[in-house]
C-alpha cells in the first residue's frame, strides 16, 4: 500500500511492476550516450598518444593491466654476511627503491613514520597539489585513511600502492586491510618494529598479538623475513602477487645476514618455509622452526644442540600462508610426520603454532604484553636466548 501511495503521489501507474518512469529512462539513456561518446573520444586521443609516444603508452598499458616489464627485478640487491647486522626495515627500503626504478606506477608512503619505516622513494618527490608526479605520499597520522586510499588506488588500476607504519598500528588500519583482502586487491603493507625488539617505547608500541590476529584474516599474506636477503625476496613475492594484499613484517633492530648454500632464498621464500640448515649426515631428532629475527637465534641454538649430540634441523618459516599452498609432499619434506619433536620460536603470542609443531611440540612465545627496556635485555628476559632454547628443546 505504501508503494502504491508513493506512485499515486508522483502520478505513476499504481499497479505497474518494476516501474521505470519515462523521464528516468530518458535521463539514463542520455547518460549512456554521453558515456559512449566520452569513451570514444578518449580512445581516439589515446591512439594518437600511442602513435606519438609508443614507449610511454606501453608503460601505461602495463600499469593498467598489472604486467611487469622485463628485467623489473634486475637491480634488486643481495647481501653477504659481512653486511650484517642489518635491520630488515633497512633492507626493505633498498629493495623498494630498486624496484621503483623499473615500475614508475609504484607509489606509497607512511603514516608519519617515514624515517623509521624506510618507504621513501629517493628523488621521486612528494605527491600533492604542487606535484602530481610525486610518488611519496605523506599520509600523516591517519593509518585507516592510508590503508583505505591504498585499496582505492588498487581498485582503480594503473597504480601499485604500498602503505607503511609500525606493526602495532595495524590496529588502526585493520578494517581497510580487511576490505583489501576481501576484494583481493594487491596492496603492499610495510609494517616495521615488529616485536619487543622495538625496545624502550614499551608495551604500547610492542606488537604481541598482531601476527596471530592478522594471520587469521583470509586472503592476507604475511611475510616475516629472517634477514636482508629474505626481505629482498619478500618484496619480489609481494610485487608478483596480484590476487590479494601482502604484508611485510620487519624488524627495527639489526639482525645477522645469514649465509645460505644451495638453491638460495628465492626458492625457499617462494615456498613459505624451507630447510635452512639440516642435521649433519643424519635424520633430524629435532626441528627448530622460526620466523623473522628469531631465525638467527634458532641457528645459534642448533649449533649448541649439535655439539651435545642432538641432530637438529632449522626451518625458516617467513609465511604460513604461502606454505599452506604447497603440496603435502613438500610440507612433509620440511616437517616429516615421523619427527614429532619440534620447537617454534617467535617473538609474539604462541597462538597458532600448534598447526606446525603438533601436540608433541613446544613454542617459545610471548603470551603477555611487553615492557620498556633495551631490546637485548627484553629478549633475554622473555626467554629468547640460546640457553633457554636448548633447555626447551630437551
Predicted regions and their residues:
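Thiamine diphosphate
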Residues: 1-25, 107, 114-212, 230-233, 240-394
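Active-site glycine- and acidic-residue-rich loops that bind
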Residues: 84-90, 225-232, 296, 323
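Short alpha-helical segments and helix-capping/turn motifs at coil-helix boundaries
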Residues: 89-98, 148, 172-176, 232-236, ...
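Short coil/turn connectors at secondary-structure junctions
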Residues: 102-106, 131-135, 156-160, 183-188, ...
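Residue-level signal for short, function-critical loop segments
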Residues: 112-114, 165-167, 193, 252, ...
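Conserved acidic/glycine
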Residues: 1-142, 148, 152, 287, ...
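General beta-strand structural signal in soluble alpha/beta enzymes
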Residues: 109-110, 139, 162-163, 189-191, ...
Amino acid at each position: 500500500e505504501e508503494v502504491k501511495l508513493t506512485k499515486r503521489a508522483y502520478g505513476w501507474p499504481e499497479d505497474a511492476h518494476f516501474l521505470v518512469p519515462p523521464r528516468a529512462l530518458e535521463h539514463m539513456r542520455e547518460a549512456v550516450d554521453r558515456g559512449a561518446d566520452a569513451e570514444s573520444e578518449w580512445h581516439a586521443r589515446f591512439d594518437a598518444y600511442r602513435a606519438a609516444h609508443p614507449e610511454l603508452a606501453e608503460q601505461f598499458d602495463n600499469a593498467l593491466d598489472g604486467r611487469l616489464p622485463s628485467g623489473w627485478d634486475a637491480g634488486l640487491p643481495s647481501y653477504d654476511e659481512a653486511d650484517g647486522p642489518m635491520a630488515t626495515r633497512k633492507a626493505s627500503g633498498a629493495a623498494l627503491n630498486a624496484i621503483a626504478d623499473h615500475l614508475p606506477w609504484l607509489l606509497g608512503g607512511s603514516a608519519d613514520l617515514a624515517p623509521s619505516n624506510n618507504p621513501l622513494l629517493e628523488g621521486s618527490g612528494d605527491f600533492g597539489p604542487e606535484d602530481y608526479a610525486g610518488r611519496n605520499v605523506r599520509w600523516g597520522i591517519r593509518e585507516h585513511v592510508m590503508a583505505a586510499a591504498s585499496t582505492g588506488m588498487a581498485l582503480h588500476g594503473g597504480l601499485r600502492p604500498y602503505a607503511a607504519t609500525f606493526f602495532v598500528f595495524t590496529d588502526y588500519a585493520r578494517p581497510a586491510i580487511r576490505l583489501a583482502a576481501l576484494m583481493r586487491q594487491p596492496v603492499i603493507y610495510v609494517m616495521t618494529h615488529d616485536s619487543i625488539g622495538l625496545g624502550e617505547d614499551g608495551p604500547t608500541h610492542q606488537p604481541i598479538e598482531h601476527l596471530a590476529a592478522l594471520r587469521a584474516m583470509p586472503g592476507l599474506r604475511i611475510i616475516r623475513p629472517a634477514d636482508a636477503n629474505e626481505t629482498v625476496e619478500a618484496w619480489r613475492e609481494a610485487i608478483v602477487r596480484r590476487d590479494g594484499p601482502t604484508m611485510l613484517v620487519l624488524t627495527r633492530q639489526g639482525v645477522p645476514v645469514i649465509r645460505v648454500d644451495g638453491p638460495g632464498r628465492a626458492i625457499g621464500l617462494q615456498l613459505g618455509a624451507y630447510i635452512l640448515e639440516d642435521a649433519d649426515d643424519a635424520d633430524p631428532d629435532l626441528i627448530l622452526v622460526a620466523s623473522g629475527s628469531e631465525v638467527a637465534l634458532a641457528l645459534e641454538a642448533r649449533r649448541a644442540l649439535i655439539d651435545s649430540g642432538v641432530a637438529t634441523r632449522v626451518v625458516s618459516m617467513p609465511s604460513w600462508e604461502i606454505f599452506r599452498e604447497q603440496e603435502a609432499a613438500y610440507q612433509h619434506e620440511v616437517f616429516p610426520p615421523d619427527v614429532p619433536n619440534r620447537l617454534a620460536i617467535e617473538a609474539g603470542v604462541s597462538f597458532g603454532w600448534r598447526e606446525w609443531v603438533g601436540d608433541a611440540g613446544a613454542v617459545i612465545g610471548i603470551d603477555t604484553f611487553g615492557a620498556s627496556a633495551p631490546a637485548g635485555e627484553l629478549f633475554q628476559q622473555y626467554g629468547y636466548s640460546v640457553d633457554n632454547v636448548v633447555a626447551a628443546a630437551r
